[in-house]
Amino acid sequence: MRLSQYFLPILKENPKEAEIISHCLMLRAGIIRQQTSGIYSWLPLGKKVLDKVCTIIREEQERAGALEISMPTIQSADLWRESGRYDDYGLEMLRIKDRQERDLLYGPTNEEMVTDIFRSYVRSYKDLPLNLYQIQWKFRDEIRPRFGVMRSREFLMKDGYSFDLDYESAKTSYNRMFIAYLRTFSRIGLKVIPMRADTGPIGGELSHEFIILAKTGESAVFCDKRFLEMTAPPVSVDFTDNVVLTDIVKQWTALYATTEEMHNAEEWAQICKSNQLSARGIEVGHIFYFGTKYSEPMGAKVMGRDGKEYPVFMGSYGIGPSRLVAAAIEASHDENGIIWPKPITPFDFGIINTKSDNAKCYGMCETLYQGLVNAGFDPLLDDRNERPGAKFATMDLIGLPTQIIVGPKSAAQDEVEIKDRKTGTKEVLTVEAALNRLSAM
């Protein structure tokens, strides 16, 4: 993509309404635009990042055996009355009526609807286990939306739901998603710590939040420092082997880690002080096991091996892709702008032509650009007729991991400069050597 043909509305000044760095940088870098309180449009640069996050989520869900569906954003209130949550959920749920005066709602979550889908088709234990998920926009009427897309009213959510015959099988499904989430966040470039958490309005017996540590986090968290040394399960993990899954989850839950709501001062005191870490954290995922909380009142039952009917055991699993984008920025930025993790960078490389009217610079930039495109990469070429300082500032702000700088002096020597956005290290290479180096990244 050539920047002269791209829609990238950069803001030079920090927006007054931005309270945290991710909100500020997402507005300044032309990633989002606020339409009204807590509701945002995603602009081209942001949409590319969001799509990459969703692609990784889908790949890991598929690897773990989950099946993607798509449910409507508007739901019937009758389903929520069946589960007993219609009156309990509170003012966060946007209640509406259609022209026939039927009670509807803009879905804040989908336990009831997916349970209705399940009970309409599944009758036998032979069709279990089953895990269905979607990536869909949701709405919760937050009393005080703030921090940009970190706490917005409309947000993108991957919500998944598992159905099993008994507790043992349901726990395996829970473990499967636990591990899939560890892999998902690791691939996105985030270090997460799974923490025991309150089940909240979803309900249930078991719940883990996946937290990244950040100074601007809205949650107080307490964990063992040794979590920071742990690495996510490999791609080779066998999601069909219950013993393997159980062992991995045990490793990741053996150390103390909890949110403020579940914090136990006595257990905390037993941890060596050198391993104690109290910090702020951002929730990027949440998983729940809630047994028959929804299947029982809604009649989601299957015929067991003994010919008797049993309500299915369920779990739900959420990741907020839109929130994840902001969390990635909170975790990786500097005074000049964003530093994207490579897996979710909007463009693979940024090419800066510091002298657009110089024929030599133009030719070398074109060679680099076409060479990278032909090699399967997605580069961004800043070919605008702007001063070099403005081009450097733009490229630093939008955070592409690798910059390729072409100027008259280096071009005269048939050389270009490669700069690592995170470390600031630079390397001077010929165009051919640069293409070889970049293609190997």
Curated annotation (Swiss-Prot):
Main subcellular localisation: cytoplasm
Reaction(s) this enzyme catalyzes, per UniProt: tRNA(Pro) + L-proline + ATP = L-prolyl-tRNA(Pro) + AMP + diphosphate
Any single GO BP term: prolyl-tRNA aminoacylation
Keyword entries, A-Z: Aminoacyl-tRNA synthetase, ATP-binding, Cytoplasm, Ligase, Nucleotide-binding, Protein biosynthesis
General function of this protein: Catalyzes the attachment of proline to tRNA(Pro) in a two-step reaction: proline is first activated by ATP to form Pro-AMP and then transferred to the acceptor end of tRNA(Pro).
Family statement drawn from the similarity comment of this UniProt entry: Belongs to the class-II aminoacyl-tRNA synthetase family. ProS type 2 subfamily.
Protein name: Proline--tRNA ligase
UniProt source species: Bartonella bacilliformis (strain ATCC 35685 / KC583 / Herrer 020/F12,63)
